[in-house]
Amino acid sequence: MSGFRVLDLVKPFSPFLPEVIAPERKVQFQQRVMWTIITLLIFLVMSEIPLYGIASSDSSDPLFWLRMMLASNRGTLMELGISPIVSSGMLFQLLQGTKIIHVDMQNKNDRETFQTAQKLLAILLAVGQATVYVLTGMYGPPSSLGVGVCSLLILQLVFASTIVILLDELLQKGYGLGSGVSLFTATNTCEQVFWKAFAPTTSTSAKGTEFDGAVVAMFHLLGSRKDKKRALIESFYRPNLPNMFQLLATLLVFFAVVYLQGFRIELPMKSTRQRGPYGSYPIRLFYTSNIPIMLESALASNIFIISQLLFMRWPNNLFVKLLGTWDARAGSSQLYANGGLAYYIQPPFNFTDALLDPIKTTIYIAFVLGSCAVFSTTWIEISGTSPRDVAKQFKEQGLVIAGHRDTSAYKELKKIIPIAAAFGGATIGALSVVCDLMGTLGSGTSILLAVTTIYGYYELAVKEGGFNKSIVSGFSDGI
């Protein structure tokens, strides 16, 4: 390729960026499992190590409802979670999808430069987010902490984010299974759901001391109350603490997503190079997996962060108010959007709130479904799964769609793949909205990411580990 491109600006930084060297040969499945477990353990340890030097972390949390999805744990090395990686990926997706930057993903040098640019931006975003967090007083007044402690806090956050970037790269380059982003999110979500279901800790409310875990609370109420019916009802609908209805809603969503994973269109294929039985190429409903909802959440999280920080600094500015106004709910120091753009893209607290403000609910649903559909259709263009890319793969492998000419593969795929991507993205967005309205144990986004990731790992185990596929045959084989 000739001429100067914007992407070439990152090439001078390439030698200075940490990198995971790709394996020279394919890593065995057992070794990949081992490296995946090691990566997961490193993430879990970092999630429990508190930041050194913080005076307080009791201020309002801009990422309160997104921490589970971002695999973030406040006040620890994993404060930023996967936010820098996801935000960087989202930005470069938009730049490439709108043709602001031109990348030939079939060209190895272009692909490596593109990945380097994403990594560089992720590190720069980590530096920016860490600096904003520290200087806005999330860990105590900067004047009280001092320059040395503030610098140390920023350094810790950037170092931890760099480790997360490398762990993700380690998995994606073939040493492990899947991607670090999905793995960390799924692990964080499963951990939080398990804790909310079985936590033995207690909280004090107007009704007295109650167990935090929904299952533990149910057995305690049934064992300590004479009126079993009333105790059972309370365990299902108790406010302000995890309840059994939320747990059952979470399980319902889990099985619904697994069931929908099986929806697909099978294109019959035949080889032009050899005779034999026809194979098939599946085009699934969730063609782009959980990418759309992850990018939608990254977009929303950045709007929430910017809006809250600007409102804390300039609460009377008209532009800032249009972006979002914030206030704490009764009995909590946590700020929530109560006006502006941030309010309308913030999920309703529950189904009752959704009914009380139908305009907000309608705008929120339209935003989630629309952005997921757009991100999904854009993603196929840069991930090598567009109709043109798939048709090219067919041609290289000597495959054609049975009953069609060699040259008609692109036309046939163009009729199906973009629709599957858009509809699948909107569907996963709709499931996220349903989760938020039903009040599952965790946000709709995080639950969906966890389920699709777990299912993806199951498929990897079937494909590469030779495990029996009959586990979910009842959900998908007959579809």
UniProtKB/Swiss-Prot annotation:
Keywords: Endoplasmic reticulum, Membrane, Protein transport, Translocation, Transmembrane, Transmembrane helix, Transport. The chain crosses the membrane at residues 34-54, 77-97, 120-140, 147-167, 247-267, 362-382, 416-434, 441-458. One of its GO terms (cellular component) is fungal-type vacuole. GO terms for biological process: misfolded protein transport; post-translational protein targeting to membrane, translocation; protein transport; retrograde protein transport, ER to cytosol; SRP-dependent cotranslational protein targeting to membrane, translocation. Its main location: endoplasmic reticulum. InterPro entries: SecY/SEC61-alpha, SecY_CS, SecY_dom_sf, Translocon_Sec61/SecY_plug_dom. The keyword Repeat does not apply. It is found in: Endoplasmic reticulum membrane. GO terms for molecular function: peptide transmembrane transporter activity; protein transmembrane transporter activity; protein-transporting ATPase activity; ribosome binding; signal sequence binding. Gene3D superfamilies: SecY subunit domain (1.10.3370.10). Residues 1-33, 98-119, 168-246, 383-415, 459-479 are cytoplasmic. Residues 55-76, 141-146, 268-361, 435-440 are lumenal. It is a multi-pass membrane protein. NCBIfam families: 3a0501s007, PRK08568.1-5. Heterotrimeric complex composed of SEC61-alpha, SEC61-beta and SEC61-gamma. Appears to play a crucial role in the insertion of secretory and membrane polypeptides into the ER. It is required for assembly of membrane and secretory proteins and is essential for cell growth. It interacts with other membrane proteins required for protein translocation. Upon binding to SEC62/63 complex, secretory precursor polypeptides may engage SEC61 to begin membrane penetration event. A cycle of assembly and disassembly of SEC62/63 from SEC61 may govern the activity of the translocase. Belongs to the SecY/SEC61-alpha family. This is Protein transport protein SEC61 subunit alpha. It comes from Candida albicans (strain SC5314 / ATCC MYA-2876). The gene is SEC61.
